[in-house]
Amino acid sequence: MSNQLPVINLMGPTASGKTALACELYERGNFELISVDSALVYKDMDIGTAKPTREEQELYPHHLIDIITPLEVYSAAQFVEDACALIDEMHSRGKTPILVGGTMLYFKALLEGLSSNLPSADANVRAAIEEKAANEGWQAVYDELVAVDPAAGVKFKVSDKQRIIRALEVYRITGQPITKLQAEQPKNVPYRYTFHNYALLPDRLELHQRIEQRLSKMWDIGFLSEVESLIEKYDLDENLPSMRSVGYRQALEFLLKSDMSLKKKQEMEDKALFATRQLAKRQYTWLRSLQEIHDFKTYLTIKQAKEDLRNSYG
């Protein structure tokens, strides 16, 4: 592994303070920022994603923000391709990349590589799977997967809709189970980089308080109006990856129903809060699984992280 191409990975659950920390590092050294967030890639989705404002992006430019519309799909494979191109370009200019975000699948793909010969997503195959789910229910789709790929059935739950879709998509295209292909196929790992991995893992109670504060601010500054504007501008539906983002899923469901009473609005806000907490829980799980394989330095507080990283990088 070459020591000539260092890459700083700054990870953490939602609302942990990682973006603010990355911006502070940016000010102190010869760095550039790359967003590792599957929601920030979407244009016009600003409030619900806690996207850095235009003013903040002018001060701290982020790559891989606002690159597609909410109608488009962005995969982990595309992220790795884009991120590696940016990393190489930054190093050619003498910059050190800081990758910051909470989409752990993207970090995992960058650190461990992706199976190189799996088929690309097929919109028609996916539409057929989603149509079956709409007509027969997700249990029927899950049962189909278990029948052709029992190992995937052990790994996935019925609620893992995107993973089920991908596994069935691969089987319908190739005729082979995705678990078999993943075990057999080589992975493309960017060995030319030296990754320096850092993770913010604050106390759960503190994180839950930060999440509540973020969502409260989100409602106050017009998140529902933002989703209404999205509905007017785009032909949205709940199956789009963009609309499966926490907050947007609950808001879209609320706005598309006839009953928009205060009671239903409160229920929607409660669902969004619960979904965000569940997201943070999954991010913790992902981080801990990555830590079992890769070298990490973890911090329990933002203050601790700032002091240590200042000493290391500025």
UniProtKB/Swiss-Prot annotation:
Top EC class of this enzyme: transferase
Matches recorded under InterPro entries: Dimethylallyltransferase, IPT, P-loop_NTPase
GO BP: tRNA modification
Necessary cofactors: Mg(2+)
Stretches the record annotates as Interaction with substrate tRNA: 37-40, 162-166
UniProt KW keywords: ATP-binding, Magnesium, Nucleotide-binding, Transferase, tRNA processing
Regions that span the bilayer: none
Organism domain of life: Bacteria
Residues bound to ATP: 12-19
Family, similarity comment: Belongs to the IPP transferase family.
PANTHER family: TRNA DIMETHYLALLYLTRANSFERASE
Protein name as annotated: tRNA dimethylallyltransferase
The organism of origin for this protein: Acinetobacter baumannii (strain ATCC 17978 / DSM 105126 / CIP 53.77 / LMG 1025 / NCDC KC755 / 5377)
Lineage, highest ranks first: Bacteria, Pseudomonadati, Pseudomonadota, Gammaproteobacteria, Moraxellales
